[in-house]
Amino acid sequence: MFPQSRHPTPHQAAGQPFKFTIPESLDRIKEEFQFLQAQYHSLKLECEKLASEKTEMQRHYVMYYEMSYGLNIEMHKQTEIAKRLNTICAQVIPFLSQEHQQQVAQAVERAKQVTMAELNAIIGQQQLQAQHLSHGHGPPVPLTPHPSGLQPPGIPPLGGSASLLALSSALSGQSHLAIKDDKKHHDAERHRDRESGTSNSLLVPDSLRSTDKRRNGPEFSSDIKKRKVDDKDNYDSDGDKSDDNLVVDVSNEDPSSPHASPTHSPRENGIDKNRLLKKDASGSPASTASSGSSSSLKSKEVSLHEKANTPVLKSSTPTPRSDMPTPGTSATPGLRPGLGKPPAMEPLVNQAAAGLRTPLAVPGPYPAPFGMVPHAGMNGELTSPGAAYAGLHSMSPQMSAAAAAAAAAVVAYGRSPMVGFDPPPHMRVPSIPPNLAGIPGGKPAYSFHVTADGQMQPVPFPPDALIGPGIPRHARQINTLNHGEVVCAVTISNPTRHVYTGGKGCVKVWDISHPGNKSPVSQLDCLNRDNYIRSCKLLPDGCTLIVGGEASTLSIWDLAAPTPRIKAELTSSAPACYALAISPDSKVCFSCCSDGNIAVWDLHNQTLVRQFQGHTDGASCIDISNDGTKLWTGGLDNTVRSWDLREGRQLQQHDFTSQIFSLGYCPTGEWLAVGMESSNVEVLHVNKPDKYQLHLHESCVLSLKFAYCGKWFVSTGKDNLLNAWRTPYGASIFQSKESSSVLSCDISVDDKYIVTGSGDKKATVYEVIY
């Protein structure tokens, strides 16, 4: 790793005995640190391998249990048939002649005398027949030559794993699997298995109930909270969750705190945070306030188990999650996995696809050569990754094409060909040339260019992707604002002095010009006490704040008064507002409503002047072009729409396969970034069909904001991450890990500060270092 010969330092003459110097000591420490990293990585791989083996064993257990249950049912059925036939024989025999009666009675008695030799012969014959029927899928599963193991005629013997799956499908109607898969990734997400009884006392592991659709959005209410203590382990399956609901991380919510009316729930940028991936059900008795859409929002439960640590900035290159959705899963029909699976096989196939997706490259023994892994500074800031982001993004076009083909193969098949263990690097993705597995840092590609026809290719980043004027090097946490409730909305004043944090029933104002201030300078009580603030926007003059949330009214605050006061309220027909936008001339306010409409308000006359109708479900996020002529909205109906504000009509519609939770329009034009429930970030060109697809988040992307220079943007997610990306191709500039879900974010007008709001009841202020 290091050259053997070093130039003599000023403290060590060339001819003097060897003497430790500070730089060499630091180098040695770095070597040991990287060795520990390698050990950690190998242990992590071993853990993942064991988890995969465990899952496979559970699958086989369920298959065999279904076999046993089906055989038991068939045995009882045949026994009952035999009894009824015996009764019929007993009734019919007396009508025969005496001679025939004796012959038939003897034949019946002989039929009842089945010897072990006959049983073995019958079983062997059935197995041979099944082997011919299985078309060479492997040897049949041997059955014990014992009456209790007699194979009934209705269920042929099975051959190999394919036959096991076939049997699972055949018997699925008899065994009502009540199972669920709660996957947790790395420190935040662990495999947790639960078992729930069925009407037939069938116990099966939870890892087989999940569907690929991770839509678990509960809506919180007081009666739900009362039920939670008794029923916290009895959660509905993921597939039953309302597609409209999101999850707010309220791991530290006071269990005794009051809850809101059951009509609303906290959403960030128009999204119900309760809609996010549900965590460990038994970890916390907490829940939060309610939800918003009157159309189809259901009341559910959630309990999110989070560690309440201070935000930690990662000191290594951001790495795509090992089970990340493979490229093309969002709005790329050409790469979707094939359909046509039998319904009963879907839980097993989905489980395999979720647990066995393969990364495009495999980290080597050391995460990266020395000098390529960014190290944390003395203040905990994250340094620029530099060359560590080269990876697949800087290789030759031929290699990129091969990697894209490998990605397509992973998507097409849904899982790796190796099941039950972690394959060695050279076996992970056969389509990738061997030399790609050894790229610097071993980092899989996380940014893909998608053409109009769905072709995907890893993006080769330009040399100035992470350097140049206006591109940050890292971000440093400088302040923590303890709001006391889940922070679903944040905004920064211009000039940068005050930060506004929206929580439950109030907006708190913080003076960040004096970092020592630990208390808000004022508190603006809005809506009802138990309803969450979903969005707050400052007018450019800095004297007016507009607040929306889980209520049908928007509050307009006069901040220039000696004491901030509400100077007007705007009332709409929708029960909740999920996001707000202000026109550049400050004359018009746009609100995203839970009924899918976009309300247009005249701020001077305080009247509703228009509604844009098009979203078929709640409108979750919104942004406006700098010239004030075009509006972009995202919705829970899986669409992004653009509107012409001069003509009052819809211009474009982009359809996706995932709900839209956040979006941002680049201030310099051309690019629109969209945050998905599927954990992807997609950057669309507003005039061309091609786009970029970014894969670094491990869960739902809850908020997104462009820097005012337009050269970079940030996104936050349920995975506790704050990611900074280069516009438009998504080179990762820096990454910050907080201690809970990051629900909201904002960037100051001078691009020097970032504020995030999180589920652990606080906002975090970062200074952007250039």
UniProtKB/Swiss-Prot annotation:
Residues 178-196, 209-244, 265-281, 298-308 have a biased composition (Basic and acidic residues). Residues 146-157, 255-264, 282-297 have a biased composition (Low complexity). Phosphorylated, probably by CDK1. The degree of phosphorylation varies throughout the cell cycle, and is highest at the G2/M transition. Becomes hyperphosphorylated in response to cell differentiation and interaction with HES1 or RUNX1. Ubiquitinated by XIAP/BIRC4. SUPFAM superfamilies: WD40 repeat-like. The keyword tRNA processing does not apply. Highly expressed in liver and lung. Detected at slightly lower levels in heart, brain, kidney and testis. Detected in fetal and adult stomach and small intestine, in adult ileum, duodenum and colon. Expressed in bone marrow-derived macrophages. It is found in: Nucleus. Residues 128-157, 176-346 are annotated as: Disordered. WD repeats lie at residues 470-501, 528-558, 572-602, 614-644, 696-726, 737-767. A motif (Nuclear localization signal) lies at residues 225-228. Belongs to the WD repeat Groucho/TLE family. This is Transducin-like enhancer protein 1. It comes from Mus musculus.
